[in-house]
Structure formats: structure tokens, C-alpha cells
Amino acid sequence: MSMTPREIVHELNRHIIGQDDAKRAVAIALRNRWRRMQLPADLRQEVTPKNILMIGPTGVGKTEIARRLAKLANAPFLKVEATKFTEVGYVGRDVESIIRDLADAAVKMLREQEMTKVRHRAEDAAEERILDALLPPARQAFGDEPVRSEDSNTRQLFRKRLREGQLDDKEIDIEVAESPMGVEIMTPPGMEEMTSQLQNLFAGLGKGKKKSRKLKVADALKLVRDEEAARLVNEEELKARALEAVEQHGIVFIDEIDKVAKRGNTGGADVSREGVQRDLLPLIEGCTVNTKLGMVKTDHILFIASGAFHLAKPSDLVPELQGRLPIRVELKALSPQDFERILTEPHASLTEQYAALLKTEGLNIEFAEEGIKRLAEIAWQVNEKTENIGARRLHTLLERLLEEVSFSAGDLAGQQSGEPIRIDAAYVNGHLGELAQDEDLSRYIL
């Protein structure tokens, strides 16, 4: 990650409106990962990431910042909900499975990168195997060694037809590696580590065996290309790199952290909630977790926690956990102007998406400026009157607004005389005005 904080914020601005403080905090945290890697080895070990706590109502961009950050970071990234985990000893997943899942994500990410690198070599090898199946090499009169006439006119002709896709529907018999025998193991919750170890034990069964299959050329080419690419990837080197990537660049986003905060003096289930927080402490502070890659140290993994904190407060978290999340950023509730910008400014905005979807049926719609403004006002009003669900309210309103158009798109496209359907303030009021004014209806429909 060589992007500067300013560049990271600029990239996040393409997708998320407002919330500048949160964007700056994650941009600095991400850049600090790169800065740390430039330090001498002895000093590098001492520099630990400053974990972040994002506080803000639902639907204002907390999760979206995490999603976009994952794409920008090009680093092992995992998003989890704190509510999925339970204290060790209770039924449910234990928090160490976060690191095991992060390790799996790292292997998957690096394998995809490696397979992209060897793609051209794999395509060439796959092409030769398909041509061998289409044109079995002639055998010598004395001996078993096949003779492949690389430059034979027939082979070159078939190669050309194969590349042009003329042979895609032709069926061939080809030898491909058998898939390893998948073993489904059911274990009690909280024993994922044992499940993983048993699956690894049985993973090698049937590996290396080949069998002949009758496939269409297009399907065979894809299968053989993937097989050749997998053969070109060095698994041991891949695992070593994945282990380093998890330890040095891993990012974990823990959503709904407020749901495991203890609220007031209530008892009962809160015992398990506080237990989850205490189990998270060593993970965030730095400990060693056993994964299929080996022992993973969590000292330099960046943790970003977020929560709406409607019913609980950040101070309701156990003090030790508060101390391990030193950077606090508050995300603001959305204003009517923010809703207006969300509808038009981001890359692939909601209005752009709906227009493109209807365009596939030949129906053109156009969102007028006053229509967007009125839609933003209604979204804000409904959020104020009922439950505030942030930008997610726009999805509900747009579905309702365009319900009739979406249902009759094919018929309307045939009647359209070249003029697009204009979504202006009058159209918005006609379809949403009454619903927005009636609070009882708003609660159930919008």
C-alpha cells in the first residue's frame, strides 16, 4: 500500500459521502502499515497499530468504509460481527476463529494473485492438451513415444479454430485430475480447529489420480487451464507468504461491537457478552493463534471496531478493551443534503444503477434535479419520524418509487416515443407523498 492518506480519502470519496473524520482515521492507519514496513527490523517490531473504534448510527457508512478499505488495502481483510461469537465454554464460535478465517482469506487472495500471474503459461499448456485430445499424436512404427508435429498444418488450423471459439461445442475425451474426496465433518460449535485439522487429514485422499471425462471443448479448456495454473503455483511458498501477509498486513473489522457491551446493571446473558470482550482482549493486544498456516502472531494486525451505540455507550465496554481501541471517530447522522449527494455523486450511484437496470429492457428514465431533492427530503423526514436507518432508507424509497415502472418496463419501452420517463418532484410526490405524510403507513411500508 503506497497510497498516501490524501489519495486513500480521495478514493473513499468516490463511494462514500461525508464522514471525513472516519475516512482520515482509516487512511492514516492504513498508511502507517506501509510506514512501519520501511523501518529497520528491530524498530519495526516495536511499532504496533493504533486500533480504531467507529461510533455512529446505522446506515451512515461504517460498514461501507470497511468494504472499500478492503479493496484498497490489497491486504488480508476480514469483516465479522461481534454478536456471532460467545465466551469460551458457551455454545457458539470462539474469537480465535477470526484469525483462522483471516488466514484462509490471505491464502485465497494470494492464490488468486499467483494464478493471475501464471495465467498465460497455463493457457498455453491447456491449449496444447486440448489439441492433443482433438488430434491424438501419431505413434511411431517402432516404439511407444508419440510424435507431435508442432508445425503441422492440421494442428495449426485447429489451434486457430480453437482460439476463435469455433470448436467450443465439440465434445472430447480428456484426462483431468480427480477432485480430492470432500469429507464433511460435523462437530459441536466452538470446535472449528478440530474440524479443520480432520479435513486437512482427509484432503489428500485421491489426490493425483486422473480420470477420463467427456466434456465440451469450452468446459474442458477452463478446467484444464485451472488445473495447469494450480500446478504452476508453489503451495509451500504461497503459505509462507500468506502467513507473513496476515501477521504484517492483516486487517480485521469487528462490526456490532456495541451489542456485546454490558448495559447498566442487567444480568443473565450479559455474562457471555462480557466474556466475548475479555476473549477479544488478548487477540487485539497480541497473542499467538494456531491456524492451518502455522502459529500466527496477532501483534501487528489492525483491528477496526464499530457500533451504533444506541442502547449502550462506548464507556460500557470493559476498560481494558477501551484502552486497546485508542482512536475514536464519530460518524454523523445524515442530513437531507447528504441524501441528495448520495443519490448522485458516488461512483455507480443509486439513480445510475436503477437507470442502467431499466435500460436493459430499452426503457429510458431520467432523474430530474428537483425529483432527487424531493426524494432526499422524504428519506430524511421518514427517518426522523420513524426509525433512523440512514442511507438504507433510500433503497426502500427507490424500490417503492419505481415499482410500477419496473413491473411494466417491457410494455412501457414499446410505447416510449424517444422521450425518457422523467422522475421529477411531481412524480415523487405522486408516488411517495401520501405515504411519507402518514406516519403509521411509513412505519410499515417505508
Curated annotation (Swiss-Prot):
UniProt keyword terms in alphabetical order: ATP-binding, Chaperone, Cytoplasm, Nucleotide-binding, Stress response
Q: Report the protein name in the record.
A: ATP-dependent protease ATPase subunit HslU
Q: Which organism is it from?
A: Ectopseudomonas mendocina (strain ymp)
Instruction: Spell out the subunit comment.
Output: A double ring-shaped homohexamer of HslV is capped on each side by a ring-shaped HslU homohexamer. The assembly of the HslU/HslV complex is dependent on binding of ATP.
Gene Ontology annotations of biological process type? protein unfolding; proteolysis involved in protein catabolic process
Q: Which family does it belong to?
A: Belongs to the ClpX chaperone family. HslU subfamily.
* SMART domains found in the cross-reference section: AAA (SM00382), ClpB_D2-small (SM01086)
Q: Where does ATP bind?
A: I17, G59, V60, G61, K62, T63, E64, D255, E320, R392
- Output the HAMAP family linked to this UniProt entry: HslU
InterPro entries hit by this protein: AAA+_ATPase (IPR003593), ATP-dep_Clp_protease_ClpX (IPR050052), ATPase_AAA_core (IPR003959), Clp_ATPase_C (IPR019489), HslU (IPR004491), P-loop_NTPase (IPR027417)
Q: Which GO terms describe its cellular component?
A: HslUV protease complex
